[in-house]
Amino acid sequence: MYRSEIVGQEKLKSQLRKMISKGQSPHCQLFIDSKGYGGLPLALFSALELIYGFEFLNNEEQKGVSSHKLLYHPDLHFIYPVINKSSGGSKATSEDYSENWFVFLNNHPYGGSQDWINQLEAGNKQGIIGVEEVSRIHNKIHLKAHSGGKKVMVIFGVEKLSES
């Protein structure tokens, strides 16, 4: 997300930008919030700043390019709770739901993990981030960055991590 798309949080946005511009960004950043407070938009803002840089993002915003188009970068990975479609067979992964995920980001940037699960029309099923997904995280992190810069992984709904 562009900085201007995030409601409030001016001090935090400035601190994030300053940290990134000085190259002082930690290898792991944790955004904890209550539903609707902007943790996900701040994480997306931070991710885009790390990958593209301030000047590029500023130019794209001036040109009217949607920030959501910038989320489709090969070095930006998303992990989120998923619903297994059927019993047996292979387990569902985040990649199976990527189209739904980008629709969710576009329509509900301040949504919580339950909003995400509701969008999947899961009925009474619970979304989880399973062992297979954690293994995929490990594999993705060890890949070389596509553009030679930074790689970013946004893990949404981490409270849904499961041992199965």
Label the model's feature ranges.
Residues 2-160:
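Clamp-loader machinery-focused feature within the broader ASCE/P-loop NTPase space
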